[in-house]
Amino acid sequence: ETWPVFKKFKETVAPNHEHWSTIQSVEYVLRYDVTPYMKRIIHTPTLMVTSAYDDITMTEFEVPAFNKLPTPTKRLVQIGGDASHMSLYDNPDHLNLVGSACANWCRDHL
């Protein structure tokens, strides 16, 4: 699902974009554990935006981890409907929802 989106970006807005994944980079992602660092996010406003049907990232692990953050100022935004991980980037309606959520968060917390 990612290749058509990045191919379109390269053809239309980012001609110098190169999108490479290596076996090593995938292995690093799969081994990464954020848990030891979560306790440091105490007084930091934190926003997490996901799609309801994310088929690329592991939201079944990410959302519970987000919920364990000790900061009282956090917000989880899940874009519903038919939103997928990549549609948050290439579907104008989904992108507007993400942009609005992020702009509101920045207005309130920066």
Over which residues does each language-model region extend?
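Conserved alpha/beta-hydrolase "acid-adjacent" motif
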Residues: 30-33, 50, 55-61
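Generic recognition of short, well-ordered alpha-helical segments
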Residues: 60-64, 93
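Catalytic histidine neighborhood in serine/cysteine hydrolases
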Residues: 69-86
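Short, conserved loop/helix-junction motifs that constitute active-site signature segments
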Residues: 39-42, 68-72
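Alpha/beta-hydrolase
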Residues: 1-37, 47
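C-terminal alpha-helix
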Residues: 101-109
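Short beta-strand/loop motif that positions the catalytic acidic residue
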Residues: 41-42, 47-50
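Catalytic histidine-centered segment of alpha/beta-hydrolase-like enzymes
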Residues: 82-96
